[in-house]
């Protein structure tokens, strides 16, 4: 799998399978990395969030920031957003308290943007726990991968 770093200051690019997309900006909204999966159904964007917390709820504004940023980076983002399946995988260290419930998307004051909340509601959520050895191997292999 290729590692593809991205930022919003370049030309828009095509979203492809076979790449692990890693944002170049610190504190990227919503996720740490993501990749696209091809299968029998619609293509799926698998979002990866590494966390030690037993909960990792988000806010509508964070979903909005993510959507806006992705629209600046990838060609045809509105079609992708509507047509692709969505998953988020919470990756946790074995010593963390496992996330066991669906993580919420909250609104603060004012009217919520239905598009942001609708996207969050479409995202299937999963949790995986990695032992220290597996986590280290995963990190090492990611570092050795070619850049796109």
For each predicted feature, which ranges?
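Charge-enriched interaction surfaces
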Residues: 1-148
